[in-house]
Amino acid sequence: MPRKGPVPKRDVLPDPIYNSKIFTKLVNQLMWDGKKSLAEKICYGAFAIVQSKTRREPLEVFEEAMKNITPIVEVRARRVGGANYQVPVEVRSDRRQTLAIRWLVGYARKRGEKTMAERLAGEIMDAANHTGAAVKKREDTHKMAEANKAFAHYRW
């Protein structure tokens, strides 16, 4: 913990082709071991596949997919009198985006297609069509929050 106050948030730079910060965040989430150029190659490849299969602008499809994955509420564990309660809380806007990208990349990695670009493209297209594992994760998160609505008064 720094003593000089809060650490300022680092701003990500938009990528050169799509001029989008959210695309850069996708690349950064996909990156392993600092291999950013490889992650960019995979993302651009995935966007090319999305464009060829949907005949639409890939960034539009990606933003639609993000809208369908982004969670609004989640549950957080809260200990009250020796019992743990799952308390539903609203998700902050920056965390919403981060969670959506994390889920998208995570479930893309688990898919069965041959290359990572194909997996990512498949997950993006599925999410844009309200199907796929990432959308299911969002629905499950919302269901969990709905089921624990009774503990909402424990919010902090």
Curated annotation (Swiss-Prot):
Cellular component GO terms held in the UniProt record: small ribosomal subunit
Coiled coil start-end: none
Signal sequence extent: none
One BP term from GO: translation
Molecular function (Gene Ontology), one example: tRNA binding
Keywords: Ribonucleoprotein, Ribosomal protein, RNA-binding, rRNA-binding, tRNA-binding
Known function: One of the primary rRNA binding proteins, it binds directly to 16S rRNA where it nucleates assembly of the head domain of the 30S subunit. Is located at the subunit interface close to the decoding center, probably blocks exit of the E-site tRNA.
Family: Belongs to the universal ribosomal protein uS7 family.
NCBIfam families referenced in this protein's UniProt entry, alphabetically: rpsG_bact
Self-association and partners: Part of the 30S ribosomal subunit. Contacts proteins S9 and S11.
Entry protein name: Small ribosomal subunit protein uS7
Native source species: Syntrophomonas wolfei subsp. wolfei (strain DSM 2245B / Goettingen)
Phylogenetic classification of the source organism: Bacteria, Bacillati, Bacillota, Clostridia, Eubacteriales
Name of the encoding gene: rpsG
